[in-house]
């Protein structure tokens, strides 16, 4: 599978995921494939980190007794952050496996 084919499959997967989430996304190829992938990867890592930070802040506010912060909201945010982290780890593992498979291909 060529790099262009891989990027095309990844773009289609992103479109499907966005449509499933209810967002509309237009099909466009990134200007440079490497930069597009790196920016998506960095964006995802920052988003996961942001979810974890927000969950911790909400938990701290709940512990301090700030009005308007309910336990169920704290628990839901903590679970969302946990699921996002586990998803990120699984995606990382799949990318490493794909990289190793490509590197082991005979030329």
Curated annotation (Swiss-Prot):
Organism domain of life: Bacteria
Organism of this sequence: Sodalis glossinidius (strain morsitans)
GO molecular function terms listed in the Swiss-Prot or TrEMBL record: cytoskeletal motor activity; structural molecule activity
Record key words, sorted: Bacterial flagellum
Name used for this protein in its record: Flagellar hook-basal body complex protein FliE
InterPro entries: FliE
GO cellular component: bacterial-type flagellum basal body
Keyword Transcription regulation: no
NCBIfam families, A to Z: fliE
UniProt record similarity statement: Belongs to the FliE family.
GO biological process: bacterial-type flagellum-dependent cell motility
Localization of this protein: Bacterial flagellum basal body
Main location (coarse class): other
């Amino acid at each position: 599978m060529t790099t262009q084919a891989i990027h095309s499959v990844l773009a289609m997967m992103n479109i499907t995921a966005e449509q499933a989430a209810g967002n509309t996304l237009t099909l466009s190829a990134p200007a440079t494939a490497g930069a597009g992938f790196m920016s998506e990867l960095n964006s995802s890592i920052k988003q996961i980190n942001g979810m974890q930070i927000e969950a911790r802040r909400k938990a701290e506010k709940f512990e301090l007794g700030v009005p308007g912060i309910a336990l169920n909201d704290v628990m839901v945010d903590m679970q969302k952050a946990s699921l996002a982290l586990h998803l990120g780890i699984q995606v990382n593992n799949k990318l490493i496996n794909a990289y190793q498979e490509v590197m082991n291909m005979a030329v």
